[in-house]
UniProtKB/Swiss-Prot annotation:
This is Shikimate kinase. The gene is aroK. It is an enzyme of class 2 (transferase). It catalyses: shikimate + ATP = 3-phosphoshikimate + ADP + H(+). It comes from Nitrosomonas europaea (strain ATCC 19718 / CIP 103999 / KCTC 2705 / NBRC 14298). Pathway: Metabolic intermediate biosynthesis; chorismate biosynthesis; chorismate from D-erythrose 4-phosphate and phosphoenolpyruvate: step 5/7. Catalyzes the specific phosphorylation of the 3-hydroxyl group of shikimic acid using ATP as a cosubstrate. CDD domains: SK. HAMAP family: Shikimate_kinase. GO terms for molecular function: ATP binding; magnesium ion binding; shikimate kinase activity. Belongs to the shikimate kinase family. One of its GO terms (biological process) is amino acid biosynthetic process. Pfam families: SKI.
């Protein structure tokens, strides 16, 4: 079964550049991490504060296909979904001045990891599995978590994906239990620091979490 595609890019509301907290953060900001790590919540707030456009790749896939993620998994399987995800990702990263929230499994393909690093500053939102479970265990829109033991599945996925997130990221931030606004303010500081170090050193640094 093939879903319809609509290639008009979906945008968030016009960025709030008047009250922007950007200082100087050029280019795209790409958020990676496990499901439940806060990519969408953080991404929307960050985009508003730094005057960029927010795009959620899962929402874009659903908009283009006209169906929810669980339906794609049911009909095409995870492999079919990953193929669509990669296609949409290639389209989106060509956009300028965006904050992109990726899907949790977007980093599974090596080409995707290279693409993300090439087209923006990649930020890994890292949260403990216990916190991920608290945020996701009632969510029926996550096909990989429709299992009898959500905690065990999250451990399995985290074990598989954490090294790939770390390999891909320029910045790693702990997105555990703190307010979204406090987290985003810390992230903006890290992004400014990262940009300064990139300018001086000529290559993106990997900033490890200090708290």
């Amino acid at each position: 079964m093939h879903f319809r595609y609509n290639y008009r890019m979906q945008r968030s509301k016009t960025p709030n550049t008047k009250n922007s907290d950007t200082g100087s953060i050029p280019g795209n900001i790409i958020l990676i991490g496990m499901m439940g790590s806060g990519k969408t919540t953080v991404g929307k707030l960050l985009a508003n504060l730094v005057g960029k456009t927010f795009i959620d790749i899962d929402h874009e896939i659903q908009r283009r296909t006209g169906v929810g993620i669980p339906v794609i998994f049911e009909i095409e399987g995870e492999a079919g979904f990953r193929k669509r995800e990669s296609e949409v990702l290639r389209d989106i990263v060509r956009q300028q001045n965006i904050v992109l929230a990726t899907g949790g499994g977007a980093i599974l393909h090596p080409d995707n990891r290279a693409l993300l690093r090439q087209h923006g500053t990649v930020v890994y939102l890292c949260a403990p599995v216990t916190e991920l479970r608290r945020r996701t265990y009632l969510d029926k829109n996550r096909p990989l978590l429709q299992t009898g033991n959500v905690h065990a599945k999250l451990i399995e996925l985290f074990t598989q994906r954490d090294p790939l997130y770390r390999e891909t990221a320029h910045i790693i931030m702990d997105s555990g239990r703190q307010s979204a606004r406090a987290f985003v303010q810390k992230l903006i500081q890290k992004l400014r620091q990262s940009n300064q170090e990139f300018t001086a050193a000529g290559s993106p640094p990997c900033v490890k979490p200090s708290e």
